[in-house]
């Protein structure tokens, strides 16, 4: 683990404790919720971890328009009319793709998504599978984890998260970095 953290340290400025906790939670097969204000490097940290671990990364932007169908996927309507319902005409959404591939599903701003969409995620976190009408059961492949991020509740457009979510995740607070780390981030962005 020490070697992995050293490699991650070359991709992510600071955040040593957060990297250690995220890697430990993933190693323990746990889902993760990162809580903190915008611009604190939550997405950057997770992309680096997925890349170093060789795990797929499915990104979902959480907003009021994220329906269960957009998250799960759907049958191609034109092909349903000609061929009927068949597994080969189902178009995977990011959740289904992550389940099948054993990837990380990263839901940004989870506290902005509708309750019915959140309920789909709660079921998948608990059961480690998804049941899709006319398609059947999709079990989570080894490596699948939900990693979500959220801004503080008082941010505009956010909602409180159900305790059912909190019961199923490791929570990690992420705050702004020290001034010298922020300067290093800017220097890296300008140089690279």
Protein language model annotation of sequence segments:
Residues 1-192:
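AAA+ P-loop NTPase catalytic core and its hallmark functional loops
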């Amino acid at each position: 683990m020490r070697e992995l953290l050293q490699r991650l340290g070359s991709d992510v400025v600071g955040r040593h404790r957060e990297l250690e906790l995220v890697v430990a939670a993933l190693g323990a097969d746990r889902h993760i919720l990162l809580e903190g204000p915008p611009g604190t490097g939550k997405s950057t940290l997770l992309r680096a971890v997925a890349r170093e671990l060789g795990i797929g990364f499915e990104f979902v932007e959480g907003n009021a328009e994220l329906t269960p169908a957009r998250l799960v996927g759907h049958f191609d309507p034109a092909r349903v009319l000609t061929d009927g319902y068949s597994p080969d005409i189902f178009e995977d959404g990011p959740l289904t793709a992550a389940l099948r591939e054993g990837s990380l599903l990263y839901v940004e701003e989870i506290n902005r998504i509708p309750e019915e969409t959140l309920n789909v995620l709660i079921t998948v976190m608990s059961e480690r599978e998804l049941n899709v009408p006319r398609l059947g059961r999709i079990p989570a492949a080894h490596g699948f984890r939900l990693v979500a991020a959220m801004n503080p509740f008082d941010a505009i457009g956010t909602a409180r998260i159900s305790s059912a979510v909190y019961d199923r995740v490791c929570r990690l607070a992420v705050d702004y970095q020290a001034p010298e780390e922020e300067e290093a981030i800017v220097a890296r962005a300008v140089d690279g």
